[in-house]
């Protein structure tokens, strides 16, 4: 069975293709399960408008579109409605309301510390050791809520780091120990792997990270992190990820629901 629970839509402002294009591509790529997990529609306290996620007013359209595709393609592929989101203490209740309104699952992808409207993208500041540890702390807090299904790109912090330093090890230990204790998978991110294989490296998946964290024996799930339907047809990237993880001795899982 081939599952992917990390699929975006154009509502996030940095993806291409229609929602149905992703479903058709998933069928072409041999997927049995496709989960849409676009960036969460945070309702910020300030007038700030995000450049990288749907607006709160787009949630209903997103939900209705995914559910309509779920019915249209029933019997061909199982489709699920989810969101990728950070853990923000002050906005946590918004996720509970989205869950009550039909969101089937959340994946924990920490892109901003504390709140997007007041802080830069973590990939650009995690070269600073204190920021990296705060990133790890916030990720651990999210894990311990029990709300999220898995941790997306846990090694995102290597984006602007050239060496896997002792602080990087400490952050990895914090995240992977918490995920292990919670029985929560961590994601091997295929968008990052695609970048590496096409000479546009993003810094993750990071080989040193994945070798180092083997000691925690985490469950690992593949996430296409699709922002283009073509990514779901790319079997070379998928197969490469499986081979790498198998070589390192990681245990793959493919379901969260």
Predicted segments, located by residue:
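Domain-core and long-helix interface of multi-subunit machines
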Residues: 101, 107-216
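Structural preference for beta-strand elements that scaffold enzyme active sites
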Residues: 2-4, 33, 78-82, 104-107, ...
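Mid-to-C-terminal alpha-helical segments outside catalytic/metal-binding sites
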Residues: 233-257
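Alpha-helical scaffolding within the catalytic cores
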Residues: 91-95, 205-206
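Short aromatic-enriched loop/helix-cap "lid" or pocket-rim segments at secondary-structure transitions
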Residues: 47-48, 94, 119-120
